[in-house]
């Protein structure tokens, strides 16, 4: 897991600093707080926030893992892969890997998400339907030229895990980062 102290974080209140204080009035449910209505939904419902990749790479990768030597898990994973291809044909879905590849410690398949709408539909669906499998959801952050900003951070500090977190071998990512910094 990433050490949070390695990174800087802008204030979440940037752009909201000079607004009136929020109230403490409780909603009719008796638990949640009432928020001031603006009549305008966040732009994040329609477009991912920068620096998420809005180009060919996609804003999020979802890696769905299975233990390749566990026959039941491998069968479930292949069935899930097929179901996703049938139910979400608009998503980019890669081949079904039967062995570890890249930084991934076990076999997996990958799905790319390009829009908040796709993310909002697929991630809750996967929460319910992933069965015994673990899934890594990580962003693809890019600079203004569309080059990846920090793959290591995207795979660690910014990652979301469903199920058991698996250790990734990020040595290749780190080497590429060092080579890029040297040039």
UniProtKB/Swiss-Prot annotation:
Pfam families: DOPA_dioxygen. SUPFAM superfamilies: DOPA-like (SSF143410). InterPro entries: DOPA-like_sf (IPR023389), DOPA_dioxygen (IPR014980). Coiled coil: none annotated. It comes from the Eukaryota. To A.muscaria DOPA 4,5-dioxygenase. This is Uncharacterized 21.2 kDa protein. It comes from Botryotinia fuckeliana (Noble rot fungus).
